[in-house]
Amino acid sequence: MKKQIGKNLMQKWKNKIRVRLSALDKKKLVLTNIPYILTAFYTNRASFLYRNSLGEDIGNKLLYAMEHADRILTGLQPSFNWRDMLTGIVAAVILKLLVWQKQSDAKKLRKGIEYGSARWGNAEDIKPYMSEDPWMNIPLTATEALTMESRPKQPKYARNKNIVVIGGSGSGKTRFFVKPSVMQMNCSMVITDPKGTLIEECGKMLAKGPPKKDKNGNIMKDKSGKVVHEPYVIKVLNTINFSKSLHYNPFAYIRSEKDILKLVTTIIVNTKGEGEKASEYFWVKAEKLLYTALIAFIWYEGDEEEKNLNTLLDLLNESETREEDETYQNPVDMMFQELEERDPQHFAVRQYKKYKMAAGKTAKSILISCGARLAPFDIAELREIMSYDEMELDKIGDRKTALFLIMSDTDTTFNFVIAMLQSQLFNLLCDKADDEYGGRLPVHVRVIADEFANIGQIPQFDKLIATIRSREISASIILQSQSQLKAMYKDSADTILGNCDTTLFLGGKEKTTLKEMSELLGKETIDLYNTSETRSNQKSFGLNYQKTGKQLMTEDEIAVMDGGKCILQIRGARPFFSDKYDITKHKNYRLLADENEKNRYKVEKELNPQYTPKSEEEVEVIHVELSE
């Protein structure tokens, strides 16, 4: 019995040793022990030579061994005498102990980077993040770019295409970032155009489009040898001059009750109610109930031509209440009563009944706040623009499209329309990618949001920007300072910035931005040289050299940065201090109105086929002779 227990214990120990040996890196084990094996071998040979040396005492033996020391290195046969073997093992063990002692007492020195290892990036640092095909890059600086490929050869260099661009007024956000991105023409683009000039300067180039390529990436040509181009579908929503805008109807993109709730939230967030009560939680919730009920009624029960915000306004105008007569029924009450008789569980009915719990005076206050909130829709031009839809937002990820959102940079009255569109756009494209394309749109969609802080608040944007990457959607947020984003999105601002792998700083003087930029750049280690002079009967001088840490670029250095320079930061890479992108060197610059005024895109003419050109405009006259 005892023998059996002993055998079991031995077997367990053997198994443990076998497991330990299998877990070891055998190659590393051999390489790290080669010095000790060689020490044991040559000490063994030296001991053998000493024992067989001629001489009667230790001194003579040592002299003989030293004279014939070359014999230690020439032979490959170790001595198997126990004395020689023991000497070799002891020497190897002593060496191992000395090395171990040295390593345990070693100082953890970081020579040259004691106070920080920050440095500026170079060509080798940016190379993994750029595509070999220059047309598949997002130009960032004169020397750096970011690949559009979502799955690079080395996954560790994959970065999302969300970009934060920060630059004060006049720093060249449009010229040095937006236009180079547009000139690449490598994806669909949704571009906010605060001045309405970008579409005029780039529209003709987009209408022509980039060269069409086959599956192998080769440029296609027609039978005559001319390059075949792939024109962009150009869409425009202009809230400055409605005559130069296509129509946008948010009702056209409602697919479910969930979309109704999202639309109502967007309207509430980006518009203002009436008086002090408008911002109170109760009144906002009450307004939401009424909007939800009316929009649901229109969407479910209305005719196709009635499904728009104009009908919503008409229903609000008919929703009269009388404080002195709680039993009074307005036309809207009657419509909902009829609907309830047909379908008591109807979504619109359930929302309306909750709203009708309010007393007459309260309901009247709610209606006043609703009317004030939607007051901009009383403008006939805006009502006409939103009467039907021409935007085709759900097709932007199917084909190359350029959607220009023109808004005023001085008046925010109609910016909620832009926010409404962008909110619907993100949700539409995400749903389409998941439902129809297995999670990835066939054409990447870039939202280039110039003057992002003036657009209006997009509900749950902090969550959207974290999830759109996998759907082939990206956002380029363009700001004058980081404080703008924090003012708009409060605590969510840091989450939004954290989901942007790339930051491009074009210049500015806002304190918060300068401080955060300086901290992100980190510290470098520099040599500090001090001199001292003591004056007494005898003068004495002193010199002192030491290391210290310094910000790679201090706040004041960033504030006075050369106007032609910029700072680029990509997650996982060293920061880059580079020249701003020179758009005149881009191959497509010749197609812009900046280069040739003849390339100016006539928005009104393109949107309205019956447009009559002005006397000062150049027109091309084509004579066609028709035979019988």
Where are these regions (language model features)?
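Basic- and hydrophobic-enriched, low-structure N-terminal and domain-boundary segments
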Residues: 1-171, 175-178, 215-223, 523, ...
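P-loop NTPase motor domains
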Residues: 2-5, 38-42, 159-473, 488, ...
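Short alpha-helical interface patches
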Residues: 69-76, 83-137, 257-267, 315-318, ...
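Intrinsically disordered, low-complexity N-terminal regions enriched in serine/proline/glycine
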Residues: 79, 114, 128, 132-136, ...
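A broad, low-specificity signal for short, low-complexity segments enriched in glycine/proline
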Residues: 96, 122-128, 142-155, 362-368, ...
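General secondary-structure edge motif
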Residues: 116-118, 145, 149, 161-162, ...
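Conserved long hydrophobic alpha-helices within structured protein cores
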Residues: 133, 137-140, 416-423, 517
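Conserved ATP-driven motor cores of ASCE-family P-loop NTPases powering translocation/secretion/packaging/pilus
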Residues: 465-567
